[in-house]
C-alpha cells in the first residue's frame, strides 16, 4: 500500500508496484506486503546474504522472475505507518546504493538483459524528474533572491553534460537579466545579493 511516514518526514509515499520490468529501475513496493506462501517458496524467499539493504527489492525481483506475467499491485491508500529517522536503514542503504546495485544486477542479469530499455528509461525518468525539481527550486531561490548552496553554485560553474544538466543551467541562467553569468555573479548569489 501507500505509506504514511512520520518522524523526520511527514508525507504520503506512493509506490507504484508493477511488472518485472518496472522493478529493474527501482523498488516499487514497500517491504510490508501480502503474498501466498507458495510464491515465497517458489522464489526461495529473501537472500539472507543481503544485510546492508535492498533485500526486499531483490526479493520482489526474484518473485517476479518466477512469474513472468506477474504483477505486484499496490493498495492506493496509506495503510502503512513508517517511522523515518536520519539513521534508519532505508536512509543509510541509499548511501550504499552504488555498492549494492552490482549484486542485484548480477543476480538478475537475465531480467536486466531482457528489459534493458525499460530499466534504463525507468532510471532516466527518475533522474529527469529530480533534475526538474532541483531546477524549479533554483529558479524559485533566484527569483526570491535567496542564498544558493555551494553545491548549486558549483553546478552552475560546471554543469554536467549529456544528462540534461547543461540545459537546466541554461534555463536557470536565463533568469539572469544582466547577460551571461560570470563567476562573480554566482559568488554574489551565495551571499544572497542577486
PLM features per residue range, with description:
Residues 1-3:
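A short, conserved acidic/glycine-rich loop-to-beta-strand motif
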